[in-house]
Amino acid sequence: MGDFRSFRQNGGSSVDFDGIKISLASADKIRSLSYGEVTKPETINYRTFKPEKNGLFCAKIFGPTKSYECLCGKYKKIKYSGVICERCGVEVTSSRVRRERMGHIELASPVAHIWFLKSLPSKICILLDLTLKNVEKVLYFELYIVIDPGVTTFTKNELITDEAYMNAVREYGPDSFTAMIGAEAIRHMLASLDLEKMAVKLRSQAAATNSEVKKKKIIKTLRLVEQFLGSDSRPVDMILDVIPVMPPDLRPLVMLDGGRFATSDLNALYRSVINRNNRLKSLIYLKAPNIIINNERRMLQEAVDALFDNGRRAKVIKGSNKRPYKSISDMLKGKQGRFRQNLLGKRVDYSGRSVIVVGPALELHQCGLPKKIALELFKPFIYSKLELYGIAPTIKTARRMVQNEQPEVWDVLAKVIHQHPVFLNRAPTLHRLSVQAFEPVLIEGKAIQLHPLVCTAFNADFDGDQMSVHVPLSIEAQVEARLLVMSTNNVLNPANSRPIIVPSKDIVLGVYYLSLEEKGGVVHPVTFCATWEAEHAFANGDIGLHTKIRCGIELEDGVKVYTTTFGRLQLLKILPKGVPFESINMVLTVRDISNLVDLVYKTCGHGKTVEFADGIMELGFRYATLSGISFGKDDMVVPPTKSEHVRRANEEVKEYEFQYQEGLITKHEKYNKVVDAWQKCTDLVAKDMMDGISGYESVAEMNSIFMMAQSGARGSAAQIKQLAGMRGLMAKPSGEIIPNPIISNLREGQGVLEYFNSTHGARKGLADTALKTANSGYLTRRLVDVAQDSIIVEEDCGSSNGLVVRATVEGGVVIIPLSDSIFSRVSATDIIDPSDGSVIVRAGEMFDDKSIERIESLGIDSVRIRSVLTCKSKHGICRKCYGADLSNRKLVALGEAVGVIAAQSVGEPGTQLTMRTFHVGGAATRRVENSSMVAFCGGKVKFTNANLITDRDGNYVVLSRSFEILLVDSLGIEHFQGRVQYGGTVYVKEGEVVPIGKKLADWDLYTVPIVAEASGTVSYADMIEGVSYNEVHDESTGILNRMVVDWRQAESSSGLRPRVEILDESGSVAKCQYSKDAVYLLPLGAILNVSNGDVVKAGDVIAKITKESTTTRDITGGLPRVIELFEARKAKVNAVISEIDGYVEFAKDYYKSKRKVIVRSREDKERIYEYLVPKGRHLIVSEGDFIRRGEPLMDGDPDLHEILRVLGLEALAEYMISEIQRVYRLQGVKINNKHIEVIIRKMLQKVEITDAGDTTFLIGEQIDKSRVERINEVMASQGLRCCSYVPVLLGITRASLQTESFISAASFQETTKVLTEAAVAGKVDRLRGLKENIIAGRLLPVGAGYFIDKLKREFTGERQGKQVSVGVGGDLTST
């Protein structure tokens, strides 16, 4: 293994090493790396400005300040290179060495390294089995520690005061026992540790103990001991005798204009260390009293602490301007630290920046570059060409010509930029499409021109956005820019494979206008034999743009006559051959145009799509201009029916108010019903308004605003509703909806109160934008960090596993068809045609359009596909498990950085959406959920998990939590399945044949009822007023409501179980189904509908639990949900899930604050699982219900870790993907599942050992899955017992910090902690990911770098190159 000094001398080329090792530096190592001892605190001489000898900038130690010149000036010039001046002792060499050469300070007394003391868990404390507080008391000279008690009464490791120590010395003599103080004591204790014996002892202790707490502590110590044993580090090296001094050019001293100096804070910190060290030396030499020496030793320890990590232990040391000094730790960590600021975030040369304007005359591969910017960027190329063409004899002349902007320069510039692509980047760079390459076109002016179709990818608009330009210099860089980054090669969005260069805004409006057809029109349209005839007629004014005509159109298989319009024939001109005319022979909206671009891509490929996009843009702009569509006040037509709808809604609200006054409904219910009434009223007004503006006789009379919204060019029905309908309900900043709507619209203007109400939402939008952008950006950073080393590394891992995918159905409607889920994926099994037994797709083949169509037509409902989650590749992912690259729809290439693409695809919409929150201006958009079930198709009714009783009206009331209604056809094939909520009413009988549109069931959206399952008399039990329930006197109605309150707060009442019992005629508790008692426990917040002694019938509602008031859901509610899922956080209120299929029973014995629920297995009646549920929580199962494995017993989101434990990896993946997709789908964002799978794969990298077998692992230890599998293979080959393990789910932050690469983890977060742990373990970073290679300055192992790496490995066999090793404490060492 090469050491760092020789590595630097060899020029440190990137091929010299393929690993970086970090370890603890011993004192000898630090001395061997040093070029001399720094003994003086001085920096430079204030008169001569030369470095002081033996000071912090000493030229003798660190090298000359001027290249090839010694300090005294005796030797100058490069010919004396290597000579050491006999007068000043300085070596004649390049001044660059001042960035590399280190010095050292010999300490008069040892000090502890603060990272190993304070970085939790403290390494020193764990090894010595002492608390941090006690170790600090010894280190900072407060107490002595007894090393050897000898004849005294002390015990080993006991802490004693100064007084006790002196008394013992007087009593027993100084040699009768050993007690020490300071870092010397700790060093003595660490040096006396026998790690091998310690490891054996700890292993036996771990096996013997049953206490979980003790076991955890033992395992923690054992792990640390084994790390020391497995590395070259020694515990005693955590105490320093020598500290390294950083090279002076890394802590510079710069002279400012006024003769003053600016200096790095490190110099002040080093100065304080040297001063205290020198003072301590002289005190020891003078044999000063112990108390003075100890105080100085303590101060030295504090000075070194401040140098390494200022403020970590004591108060922060500040400079004269009250600013804390930046220590070595501060220089590494955080956004401004060495890792993120200088290693990962380098700035680049050859770049410019300017405002962007639209360039509709450009082609897709072009951008307009101002001449001034181009001249500056391409200067070196211009100089070279001016010289080459003989226009300028020297570079100096060339420079002058360029400065004077002579005419020849512009000609040369035009030649230089010909086919030399440039990069355009728009910040924030959220995904790879934010950087694209274009061929520059020289333009006058100062703004960069951008092609309109790439705006979507850049998320750019022309309201003052700026973009930066970068120049690829080398030929290789230019080739990559042209092949990979060129805008014409980025037609598809890598997040979802949809075209991203789709027209929008004016272009859409123009194309929509062009494709319109006159209503009514002629009965017998004019027929033309060919398009040229139609053009002739149009030119003569015989037909209009939108007149219905019949025209013969030439196709590949002959001429076919279509009924169309002249406008659509214009579109035909730019339509590539092979694309059917039917695709444009309709009114084209933005969605149709997007599908059209997709169809052109599928049919004609990449090149034709680009041409078509340019053509449609030109056409769209032209006809948007010719159409004369404008935005006028009279286009905002207020519907005449508005006042009627408002009147009706007001009456409904009055009715609810009356019901509330009468006590028929609660305050919550009234609120929800009022909100619903106004929501319906707003929707009706909006519908009438849209109907009003959508009616037209001829295209010329069409409403401009309607055309804009209808085509998808600008605005939406929701926005027009606010303009010309009614603004409707507004949301408060908390997300709650204000029940008083804004009845006016923006055309009519708003009253003062209405205006005030609407300010809520508008401000919330702006505040949200500011706050959520940061959250979203941080999520993207964490995602990139966790997935950055997911790279395609092999052809096929041979896995036959995968995920089973189905169509996504919500509320009985297919939201995402199966075809979308299997698109771009590889089949894990042979897929057989059930009709003839033929193979549609073989295992390991990718689904193409034909096979997907065939699968859909055959009605196959589930397919097993290869997935990243089940890929067996050791480091990275294989091509087959990933499937197609979504940006070109071909099987993904080797070396593709799929992890970064996944992180960008998931993170980018988060940022976009949070920025987009304020566009609707805070108008409350509430998802109106279904409160009834209607038959989508005809069929025969079938019930599952039925537990029903008949109510007073003869209808069924649902008592099961998992009751479903199915509709089957005559063959028994299921066509509809829907779940009815508990307490719902069912209007059909089993076996009944129902027509389409028949109402099957309904339920209350806003309350969960508790239903009587038997008839009888109501009896309250444990219902004590003021303790378990309160009579709430409603001020506005005067009615008493009985509400169950938290009885556990009151003393002596924690044993209460507030419940309602139903008594039969004999006075005993009535029985219901399954002969269970009619006893109903009341959860917190339940409102009683019956009084003590009331007579009830089966099916009556005894009490209601009000659901939370409806709030609006948008990604601001959704983004935290996505973060929660990716961080695998435990929800505040987790739902307990069942571990088996079985029947629910309620146990009789009750605990103080919990109740026991039993699930009894369906197969084995003796097998039961018991769950404790908090008493206040509402159970969503009833006694006797059948519950499936993994289903929740109570409301709330299930815990991800529980899903993994109970249901396994596939179910966890399915749950996480569906939950994350739900949030994005709500915002209309499409992300392919494979991106989410890539992230989840990284979250499942670790496993927990359940049985160690014959390995050295410990039970409960979390290890990398690949490492465990590797060791198990070795064990199996040697006939030894393998270890068993279960998968562990880590959140993305923890997964990033626990990655194999310590460089990547340190550059992410908790830098000092990561480096401390890596140094102790002597970790080697194999440089497999992207970040660690950027930091090491090597070629990335993706794309071309992957193949270069691969060829190198094949050429040299498995490489065993050099590894550079880095020691902690600022030193660089080799081993």
Curated annotation (Swiss-Prot):
Stored Pfam families: RNA_pol_Rpb1_1 (PF04997), RNA_pol_Rpb1_2 (PF00623), RNA_pol_Rpb1_3 (PF04983), RNA_pol_Rpb1_4 (PF05000), RNA_pol_Rpb1_5 (PF04998)
Keyword Protein biosynthesis annotated: no
Catalytic activity as recorded in UniProt: RNA(n) + a ribonucleoside 5'-triphosphate = RNA(n+1) + diphosphate
Amino acids binding Zn(2+) 1: C70, C72, C85, C88
Keyword Protein biosynthesis annotated: no
Free-text comment on the cofactor: Binds 1 Mg(2+) ion per subunit.
Cofactor(s) required, per the database record: Mg(2+); Zn(2+)
Documented EC number(s): 2.7.7.6
One Gene Ontology CC term in the entry: DNA-directed RNA polymerase complex
Uppermost EC category: transferase
Protein's GO biological process: DNA-templated transcription
Domain of life: Bacteria
Keywords attached to this entry: DNA-directed RNA polymerase, Magnesium, Metal-binding, Nucleotidyltransferase, Transcription, Transferase, Zinc
Record-listed Zn(2+) 2 binding positions: C797, C871, C878, C881
Protein task: DNA-dependent RNA polymerase catalyzes the transcription of DNA into RNA using the four ribonucleoside triphosphates as substrates.
PANTHER family attached to this UniProt entry: DNA-DIRECTED RNA POLYMERASE, DNA-DIRECTED RNA POLYMERASE SUBUNIT BETA
Protein's name in the database: DNA-directed RNA polymerase subunit beta'
Organism: Neorickettsia sennetsu (strain ATCC VR-367 / Miyayama) (Ehrlichia sennetsu)
